[in-house]
């Protein structure tokens, strides 16, 4: 079976994020980027399936000016991917609709049985790329996937989908399909930095134009850092005293007026 993994670079939250001069987005000029956590789970799941059943794993990532997609793709090779492809050339990070169109265009030139991607990314949290790719290609899809098992005949997969309250749904999905992964069975495998650097110099990173999309039509008018409150009240005393003070604060704000005091 042939697996394709769609990956994205996102801001590294270990560093301080700053708003750009226009006040409509993050300042990406000096920002550090890392692979989206959920995309790493998708890659690990694809590698586990490939290792168990054979086949190939191809990784696709969008070529965005800010960031280092070559390092991302070299990391994929270090972890065990068979082929890596940089899709398109974007001056700025594309929205979900544009990204999905680019990926869909590239997938039209590849053979695949299963397309995997992360359920969402930290810089948008909308979870749209996977479903949009599936829609563009006319494929079935399942999101929030926590388990994947390929049937013996290789024409379907059984997947588990996570719901609120610890409920898990089980679905049988006809291949080819798109799955948006919430977590993998094992932690993403380690990629030594020295090996990544070596592959960045020697590995073949293919390039594809990708599909052209009109975008979502959404415009960010303003982005601000959340305001921090100036005061906080520390409540000390016995449980009875603390409970009475909490009830009083709620009553002052018109919340829970029926709470016994």
Task: Name the predicted role of every residue range.
Residues 1-261:
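N-terminal glycine-rich FAD/FM-binding segment characteristic of electron-transfer flavoproteins
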């Amino acid at each position: 079976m042939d697996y394709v993994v769609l990956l994205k670079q996102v801001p590294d939250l270990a560093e301080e994020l700053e708003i750009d001069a226009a006040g409509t987005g993050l300042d990406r000029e000096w920002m550090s980027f890392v692979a989206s956590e959920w995309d790493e789970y998708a890659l690990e799941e694809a590698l586990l399936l490939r290792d168990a059943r054979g086949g190939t794993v191809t990784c696709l990532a969008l070529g965005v000016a800010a960031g280092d997609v070559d390092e991302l793709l070299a990391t994929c090779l270090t972890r065990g991917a068979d082929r890596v492809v940089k899709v398109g050339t974007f001056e700025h990070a594309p929205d979900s609709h544009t990204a999905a169109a680019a990926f869909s265009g590239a997938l039209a030139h590849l053979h695949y049985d299963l397309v995997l991607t992360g359920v969402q990314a930290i810089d948008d949290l909308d979870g749209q790329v996977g479903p949009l790719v599936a829609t563009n290609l006319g494929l079935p899809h399942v999101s929030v996937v926590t388990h994947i098992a390929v049937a013996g005949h290789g024409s379907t997969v059984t997947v588990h989908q996570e719901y609120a309250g610890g409920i898990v749904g089980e679905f049988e999905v006809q291949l080819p399909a798109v799955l948006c992964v919430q977590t993998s069975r094992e932690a993403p495998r380690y990629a030594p930095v020295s090996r990544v650097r070596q592959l960045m110099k020697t590995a073949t990173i293919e390039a594809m134009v990708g599909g052209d999309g009109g975008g979502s039509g959404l415009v960010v008018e303003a982005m601000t850092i959340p305001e921090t409150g100036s005061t906080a009240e520390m409540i000390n005393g016995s449980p009875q005293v603390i409970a009475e003070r909490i009830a009083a604060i709620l009553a002052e704000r018109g919340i829970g007026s029926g709470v016994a005091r």
